Amino acid sequence: MIPVLVAAGVAFLVTLVLGPVVIPLLHRLRFGQRVRSDGPTRHLQKTGTPTMGGVIFLFGAAAAVLVVAFLPGGVRAGWIEGLLVLAVALGFGVLGFMDDFAKVVHKRSLGLRAREKLLGQVLIAVALAVTAVFVLERGTDFLVPFSGIVVHGGLALDLGWWFFLGVTVFVVLATANAVNLTDGLDGLAAGTFAVAALAFAMIALVMDKTWVGIVLGALVGGCVGFLCYNFYPARVFMGDTGSLALGGGLSAAAVITKSELFLLIIGGVFVIETLSVIIQVIWYQLTGRRVFRMSPLHHHFELVGWSETRVVLTFWTVGLVLAVLGLAGLKGLG
């Protein structure tokens, strides 16, 4: 537990120190956020707020992992697992950076082309699956919350490699893009992720995956430090650079700890946000009417009169409740 706390503390401090250095730089480079004209009118004042701020806490997290790695008498076993989580997070961060760069520099409103983003995400997810099974010897089993059951080929459900590969790709892409969708209000994605990642760090420790917990702890510390600049009124946005990295890292941790199903509970806020978009699109195509005033769901609550801070704090609270519920699902496991 101590290495996890050290990683979180170092990432928090590095992020806190980097903020006043990087934010003015992003301003000078004119990496400003473009705000949707069809969104809540109060968001128009956010136009020009620097984006791509995810580089701040990603650097902080990476620095923290390096510090823990070189601590005298530090944890050595399982470092490849932690490195894999960090690599997936940084890989998605690079994709997000390229997407943000295309938006703010090349003035492409949607960033990278859809097929470019999809290809990059799939390649990273496949690399994760291959490494987890053939290098880490993870197997194709997964944990079932509240049951104490490890579902495995031949025991209860024969997943097999190809099914596992498909599930992994889906989990990684769904999680990364769900966190990306949630990043629509000041502090919403960073705070919600921090709660979920802390829960998965606990799962990792229970599963004796200390290095996975260390990397998650570093990301949590980085996000908490980032909130000092990202909570309302935000001085910087994480952009796709940050949100895709966080989702990628969280999904990688879930895959390595065999707790993909726990994502449905612990990451419930991300699931709900994504479902609100899917429901809105399908219902509108079928009926020509909308279920929500706007999707994702956080914008709906804004448009019914909630303040931005109230929406964010409410979603954080829901995320905390779901995280506790998910951890309760560990009963009988480990």
UniProtKB/Swiss-Prot annotation:
Pathway it works in: Cell wall biogenesis; peptidoglycan biosynthesis
UniProt subcellular location: Cell membrane
A GO cellular-component term linked to this record: plasma membrane
EC top class, as a word: transferase
Cofactor(s) needed by this chain: Mg(2+)
InterPro entries xrefs: Glycosyl_transferase_4, PNAcMuramoyl-5peptid_Trfase, PNAcMuramoyl-5peptid_Trfase_CS
Name the UniProt record assigns to this protein: Phospho-N-acetylmuramoyl-pentapeptide-transferase
Gene symbol of the encoding locus: mraY
